[in-house]
C-alpha cells in the first residue's frame, strides 16, 4: 500500500482550486515508486508471457507457399488499403484518383480549424467536426466494403 493523503477541505487554496475544477490530482497515491516500479513491469511481463505462450501453444503458418504460376483473378491489397484501392479503381482519371487520395489527409488536417477544439472537448458541443467525422467514417466503410466486390457492384454495394 502507498501513502494516501486525504484532502484538507478547510484549506481555502484547495477550495478555490476545486471550485475552478482543478486540484483533482492534489492528493492520492503517488505514481513513483508504486506504479512505475511494481505495477508496470508486471503488466509488461504479463503481456510478453501471454504473447510467447500463445505463440508456443498455437503456432500458425504465415500463409500458403508462393506459386509463381498461379495468379489469382483479382489481386486485392491489405484490408486497410481497401478505401484507397476503391478510389483508384472507380475513378477513370488516375490523376483525379491521386488528387482524391491526397484530399483525405488534407481534409483531416483542416478539421481542427473548423471549430474551436480547445474550447470544448465534448463531441456534442462540436457538431461540425462530429458530422465530418461520421460522414468520413461512413464513406470509408462504404469504400472499404465496395473494394471487396466486383467493379460492377462496388459503388452500389450490390443493393440497387
From Swiss-Prot:
Stored InterPro entries: Cyt_b/b6_C, Cyt_b/b6_C_sf, Cyt_b6/f_cplx_suIV, Cytochrome_b_C_euk/bac
What are the protein's UniProt keywords?
A: Chloroplast, Electron transport, Membrane, Photosynthesis, Plastid, Thylakoid, Transmembrane, Transmembrane helix, Transport
Q: Give the GO molecular function terms.
A: electron transporter, transferring electrons within cytochrome b6/f complex of photosystem II activity; electron transporter, transferring electrons within the cyclic electron transport pathway of photosynthesis activity; oxidoreductase activity
Q: What is this protein called?
A: Cytochrome b6-f complex subunit 4
The protein's matches in CDD domains, at most eight in alphabetical order, are given as: cytochrome_b_C (cd00290)
The UniProt family comment states: Belongs to the cytochrome b family. PetD subfamily.
Q: Give the protein's function.
A: Component of the cytochrome b6-f complex, which mediates electron transfer between photosystem II (PSII) and photosystem I (PSI), cyclic electron flow around PSI, and state transitions.
Q: Which organism is it from?
A: Glycine max
